Structures are given as structure tokens and as C-alpha cells.
A protein has these predicted regions:
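Proline-centered loop/turn at the N-terminus of a beta-strand
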Residues: 106, 171, 242-244, 260, ...
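RNA-binding accessory domains that recognize and position tRNA/RNA substrates
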Residues: 1-204, 208-209, 223, 337, ...
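Cysteine-nucleophile active-site neighborhood
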Residues: 213, 218-285, 296, 339-355
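Catalytic beta-strand/loop cores that center a nucleophilic Ser/Cys/Thr
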Residues: 282-324, 361-362
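Active-site-proximal beta-strand elements of phosphoester/diester hydrolases
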Residues: 171-176, 286-287, 328-332
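A glycine-centered loop/beta-turn motif at secondary-structure junctions
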Residues: 319-361
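Beta-strand-turn-beta hairpins that frame and shape the catalytic cleft
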Residues: 167-172, 280-283, 322-327
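Active-site glycine-centered loops adjacent to acidic/histidine catalytic or metal-binding residues
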Residues: 112, 247, 290, 333
Length: 362
């Protein structure tokens, strides 16, 4: 069946329908990872977005459910150059085609993903529609695309009730703004007892449980939409509890302490982004998925925090260390999945802050 990807600037890509045949409007983004497509599809940070995979062949190792980063896929749509319909992998239990159909997610294959990526890089991230309607009307569709916003998606992807992962080590409160599964796993495998809280949980409730440390997770959308959450994070900042924040959590901590964020032209999404540790000078290859960035200069001028990591490619901020506080935040994903685990030592640094076992690299 024919399918069409229509961008808000009027570009139309013709391809073949994969997955569901329903029509969808979403933000169109691209990911440069060669593998890890299941982890991408099930990453809650992609809620409200259709993802274009830049690698030309996707699906050749099938679907392995134990690799999911959450209970279900959160992408709005999936865009590939070529979809492998016959995977070869002893772990595979499903195909992308059936996986997308099962979860009612539309997609398109057979388009020039390189051309699409170049458009998004040159013009910036934009909204688009995936449709199988051959009689589409651009004059009717384009105003709808320009009016689309993702809204407050954190409340959509967060857990609905508190959950506890047992452990004999430090007690960690994980605020779930759309947390990838491997964040909790990375803490739990280090012995931590991890309590996962819904995103709108009041700070008083979290602090009443007397955690040894607080983790602010990744998540989707514009951080400035999370006004209620920002107020609660401000209260957590004022406590003496060690805090480690990742991705959206990094942005929310900056906003909670008087900093600012802004939308990037096309964001960082992939498993090959080099970041530099400004304290040691070492460079790590990181997994990233974000479309917003923290204004580090503003926080530094106020004496609230100083930059800890920068992106080697474009110089944007990748982490902050907060003055006089046991708080550090990073924009990238030390838990990886998919991607390199170069920076997993940051979980050990967090353990050390909480007084737990020090497994940090020397």
C-alpha cells in the first residue's frame, strides 16, 4: 500500500505503508544509530514524535522484547529507507511490521531518508503527517501541521503509581518523567533499592520516605511545559539529598534553579555523540536523545552551577555541577541502551555521593 510523508514546509515523500494504516501528525526527528531501533521505539522520550532512522536497513535482527526500554512503544510513527521483513537472529520473537501493527503505530518505508535528514538539518525539526490517503489536500493539511504541538507529554508517559525495586544498598527515589528501564536497572544492579515515583509526586512525599539519593529521569517534550514539576524539583534542590539528573531531568533542574533552556535546530539523537568532561579533559562517546539544551552560561554567571560536560561537535552544554550541593546533571544517557556505555561510571559517582559502594573507574 502506498503511503506519504508530508512535511509542514510542503515536501512530500512517497513510499510504502508499514505498520498501522491510520493517519498521524507528529514532530519529525531523525536518529543516527545503526542499531537499537527497538530501544528507540520504546523510549518514552520519543512520545509525540515520528522517528526517521538514518541507517538504510532497519529490522534485520528482529524484535527482542527483553530489550524494550519501557512497557510499550511511544513513538507516533516510524520512518525507514528499507525494512527487513525476514529477520535473522536467534533472540528474535517478532518483526517490526507486526510490532507496529500490534501497537497501532503507522510508518513509511522506501523513502529517501538521507534527503529527509538533510531537510531537517538545514531547516530544523518540523511537524509532518504520515498518511495512506492518496487524495491528500496540502492546502488543508499544512495549516494543521503548523498548529500541532506535543503538549504536556510527561504526564502521558509517567508511571501511574509508586513502584519499588528491592535492594540492600542506598535508597534511591527515581522521579519518572518517562524513565528508560535501564536507568532503574543501572541503579538496582549496584544494589540500590529504587522507588519509582509518578512525575507529579510532591517533593514532600518523596523526602518523607527519606531517600539516600534522588534521580531525575529522562522524558519527552518541552521542559518549560512542566511547570508543576519544576516547582517540586526546586524543593528537592533545597534539601541536602544528593541528586543525579539525566536528559529532561537535567533541563528541569536548570529551570528550577533560575536557569533557562531553548529548543535546538534539530537536536541530538543517536549513539555516537562525543562529550568532553571539563574536569578531566577526557572525551566519551555517548547516547543522546534531546531537542532542548540548557543555557549553561546563565547558571554559571549566577554562581548556581558550572558546566561539567560539553558536546565536542557543537559546543552545547552536556552537564552541570551545582555549587555547594551534591548535585550533578547530564544531558546525555549514561545508561545507554542503545549506545555506548562509556559514561556508566557516573552511576558509580552517584553511589559514592550517597555513601554506597564505590565502583567508579580510577
Amino acid at each position: 500500500m502506498k503511503a506519504f510523508l508530508i512535511l509542514e514546509d510542503g515536501h512530500v515523500f512517497k513510499g510504502t505503508s508499514i505498520g498501522s494504516t491510520r493517519e498521524v501528525i507528529s514532530e519529525i526527528v531523525f536518529n543516527t544509530s545503526m542499531t537499537g531501533y527497538l530501544e528507540v521505539m520504546t523510549d518514552p522520550s520519543y512520545a509525540g514524535q515520528a522517528v526517521c532512522m538514518t541507517y538504510p536497513l532497519i529490522g534485520n535482527y528482529g524484535i527482542c522484547y527483553e530489550d524494550q526500554e519501557s512497557r510499550k512503544p511511544w513513538i507516533d510513527g516510524f520512518i525507514v529507507r528499507e525494512l527487513s521483513r525476514v529477520p535473522s537472529n536467534f533472540r528474535s520473537v517478532d518483526t517490526i511490521q507486526h510490532f507496529l501493527e500490534k501497537h497501532d503505530i503507522p510508518g513509511i518505508a522506501g523513502i529517501d531518508t538521507r534527503a529527509l535528514t538533510k531537510i531537517l538539518r538545514e531547516k530544523g525539526t518540523m511537524n509532518g503527517m504520515i498518511t495512506v490517503n492518496e487524495n491528500y489536500d496540502l492546502d488543508e493539511i499544512i495549516p494543521r501541521l503548523k498548529a500541532y504541538t506535543t503538549g504536556k507529554v510527561v504526564e502521558k508517559v509517567t508511571c501511574k503509581e509508586k513502584e519499588v525495586l528491592k535492594g540492600n544498598g542506598p535508597k534511591v527515589a527515581l522521579m519518572d518523567f518517562g524513565a528508560k528501564r535501564n536507568i532503574a536497572h543501572s541503579l538496582n544492579e549496584r544494589g540500590c533499592q529504587v522507588t519509582i515515583y509518578p512525575a507529579l509526586t510532591p517533593a514532600e512525599e518523596i523526602l518523607k520516605d527519606a531517600p539516600d539519593g534522588i534521580m531525575l529521569s529522562n522524558g519527552p517534550g518541552d521542559p518549560k511545559e512542566c511547570t508543576t514539576i519544576i516547582e517540586e524539583i526546586r524543593k528537592l534542590y533545597e534539601s541536602d539529598v544528593p541528586i543525579f539528573a539525566i536528559c529532561l531531568g537535567h533541563q528541569l533542574m536548570a529551570l528550577a534553579t533560575g536557569g533557562d533552556t531553548h529548543k535546538m535546530k534539530y537536536g541530538h539523537r543517536g549513539g555516537n555523540h562525543p562529550v568532553k568532561d571539563l574536569e578531566t579533559g577526557r572525551v566519551y562517546i555517548s547516547s543522546q536523545n534531546h531537542g532542548y539544551v540548557v543555557d549553561a552560561e546563565g547558571l554559571e554567571k549566577k554562581g548556581i552551577a558550572k558546566p561539567a560536560f560539553i558536546n565536542v561537535n557543537d559546543g552545547t552544554n552536556e552537564g552541570m555541577a551545582y555549587e555547594g550541593k551534591n548535585i550533578f546533571t547530564v544531558q546525555f544517557h549514561p545508561e545507554a541502551c542503545p549506545g555506548p556505555q562509556d559514561s556508566s561510571y557516573l552511576f558509580d559517582r552517584f553511589m559514592k555521593m550517597m555513601g554506597g559502594t564505590d565502583r567508579a573507574e580510577k
